[in-house]
Each structure stands twice: as C-alpha cells, then as structure tokens.
C-alpha cells in the first residue's frame, strides 16, 4: 500500500540524477511539480512530458532538462529564457512508445481520491500514459507517485476496454492536494477571429461530426453552432 506524503516529502524521494515522466496538460500533478522547485541539488534530472499548465521553478534549475512532446505557453517561455527544453517530435499516437522508450524511474499523475473499490481515477487526462503508470507501479525499482485531488471529476471511457483507473495497491506514494483544476480562459475575439470563424462555419453541414481544438476560433465556432439550428 502507498505511503501518504506532503508534496515536499514526495519531492525528497527524487534523486539528484533521475527521470520523471508525466502526461499531457491535465495530468500534471501541480503540487508535486511545484515542490520540486524547492531543491537545488539536481545533477541530471530529466523530465518527459507535454503541455505544462503552470510555470515550474524546477525547470529553471541547473542540471534539469525537459523533453517535451507538445509545447504550450509555459514551454515557450522557458525555452525563450534559455532553459533546457527539448522538443520530441511525434503525434499523439507516438506518445505511448516515446514514453516507454524514455523509461522514467518515476511516473507521476494527478487523480481523484480512491473510491470504494480502492482505485483512483485519472479524471481529466487519460492519454497514453496509463500503461507506463502501471509499469512504474508494478516494478520495485521504479516509483509511482499519484497526487489526489477531491476537486477532480471522475470520468470513464465510452469504450469499456479503455480503463482510466489505477489500483491503490500499485501506487507507491500518495500526495493529498486540493487545488482548483486548471481552466482555460475564453479570450474576447477580435474582428479577424470572428471573420475566420464565420468562414469556417460555412463548411459545417447539418448532421456533421466536428472535432474542435483549443483556442479562440474553435471556441467561437463551437459557440455559434451551439446557439444555431444545426442538429
């Protein structure tokens, strides 16, 4: 069964020479990653992940590098400041094999608190990290750190074979956090954004299936469709 630690206590378990893997965006364990910034003894700490949702001081420290599969604002800022942020080319389908090849000693994620069946739910992120999370929990020479947060919703896949839970008995370290989940702000569109969205809307036929992305223009398109008469 796991030990329950504070973020700082969990951060103390990381070696000066180590590898840490995490998933995209909503998988980021914010309290743990923040606590790592309190140390300055890193010799060769390498992160493997994607799309940070916060700016973490640990990534500004000497001896720390980050292999990133998807750049967001935090990665671009860190890179512009001269820190060791390296892009790992690959599509979403390559996230799982890239992470497996990286083979971090430590895997981390945020999740819901354990349920009555003794499982945590990966909540807002499933992605391609679960197999590596499970491997980290099963091998005694690796470490699985899960940061639980009661503010996270429980989710499940439409397809039953894609489970997004992790049994508590596989977890080495539990961190109890209570921060609010990250939420994207909806910036006000300018005239150009509205014009582009209006052009895109003309290509959406009644009954179409639409995959949207993150950003002002996809938000305008989705909002206009929601308010419109298309089925």
Annotate each language-model stretch with its function:
Residues 1-231:
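Conserved alpha/beta enzyme-core scaffold
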């Amino acid at each position: 069964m796991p030990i329950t630690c504070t973020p700082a206590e969990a951060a103390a378990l990381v070696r000066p020479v180590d590898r840490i893997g995490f998933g995209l965006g909503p998988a980021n364990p914010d309290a743990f990653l923040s606590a790592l910034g309190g140390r300055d003894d890193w010799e060769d700490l390498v992160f493997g992940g994607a799309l940070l949702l916060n700016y973490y001081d640990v990534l500004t420290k000497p001896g720390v590098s980050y292999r990133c599969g998807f750049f967001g604002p935090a990665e671009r800022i860190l890179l512009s400041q001269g820190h060791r942020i390296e892009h790992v080319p690959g599509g979403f389908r390559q996230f799982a094999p890239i992470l497996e090849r990286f083979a971090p000693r430590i895997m981390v994620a945020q999740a819901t608190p354990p349920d009555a069946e003794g499982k945590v739910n990966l909540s807002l992120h499933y992605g391609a990290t679960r197999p590596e999370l499970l491997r980290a929990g099963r091998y005694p020479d690796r470490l699985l750190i899960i940061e639980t947060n009661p503010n996270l919703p429980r989710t499940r896949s439409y397809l039953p074979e894609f489970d997004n839970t992790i049994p508590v008995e596989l977890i080495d370290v539990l961190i109890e956090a209570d921060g609010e989940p990250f939420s994207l702000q909806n910036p006000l569109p300018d005239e150009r954004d509205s014009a582009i969205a209006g052009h895109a809307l003309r290509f959406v036929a009644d009954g179409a299936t639409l995959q949207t992305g993150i950003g002002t223009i996809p938000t305008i398109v989705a909002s206009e469709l929601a308010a419109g008469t298309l089925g």
